[in-house]
Amino acid sequence: MELNGIKPAAGAKHAKRRVGRGIGSGIGKTAGRGHKGQKSRAGGFHKVGFEGGQMPLQRRLPKRGFKSHLLKFNAEVTLTALEQLGLAEVDILALKQAGLVGQLAKVVKIVKTGELTKAVKLTGVGATAGAKAAIEAAGGSVA
């Protein structure tokens, strides 16, 4: 087999359907668009959500809630991520340098997801009750 002899499998490729090319083709004249109406015309499609002039559903329903801007300043780190980090002392700066939290993060909390076997000393980082128990059980501390 040579590269210049490679072909698609038989029946894998077929010519595209050419519509509007005479009644003998079976899809001539109206070309599968039916008779008259907006959808039969060239460029005859409305934008998504348009309901013919009726107030669209998206605008009929009221707005709800808001997007908290505090989310970009708060971050969570799992015990599994701490385990893989492999540092004895962890603070916010170390987590930022490792890429575990964003550069804008001001508040970081450790959550109990996964296992921790190494002793880790946390400074300036919060922890949930379960995470704190797991860190202290592994010989670490939370300050």
Swiss-Prot record:
Q: Which UniProt keywords apply?
A: Ribonucleoprotein, Ribosomal protein, RNA-binding, rRNA-binding
Region annotated Disordered, chain positions: 1-51
Disulfide pattern? none
Looking at the UniProt record for this protein, which Gene Ontology cellular component terms does it annotate, in alphabetical order?
cytosolic large ribosomal subunit
What InterPro entries does its record include? Ribosomal_uL15, Ribosomal_uL15/eL18, Ribosomal_uL15/eL18_sf, Ribosomal_uL15_bac-type
SUPFAM superfamilies per UniProt: Ribosomal proteins L15p and L18e
Cross-referenced Pfam families, in alphabetical order? Ribosomal_L27A (PF00828)
Q: Decide whether keyword Amino-acid biosynthesis is in the record.
A: no
Report a single Gene Ontology molecular function.
rRNA binding
- Gene Ontology annotations of biological process type: translation
Skewed-composition ranges (Gly residues): 21-31
Q: Tell me the subunit arrangement.
A: Part of the 50S ribosomal subunit.
Family of this protein: Belongs to the universal ribosomal protein uL15 family.
The record's annotation in PANTHER family points to:
50S RIBOSOMAL PROTEIN L15, LARGE RIBOSOMAL SUBUNIT PROTEIN UL15M
Record HAMAP family:
Ribosomal_uL15 (MF_01341)
What functional role does this protein have? Binds to the 23S rRNA.
Name by which UniProt lists this protein? Large ribosomal subunit protein uL15
Q: Which gene encodes it?
A: rplO
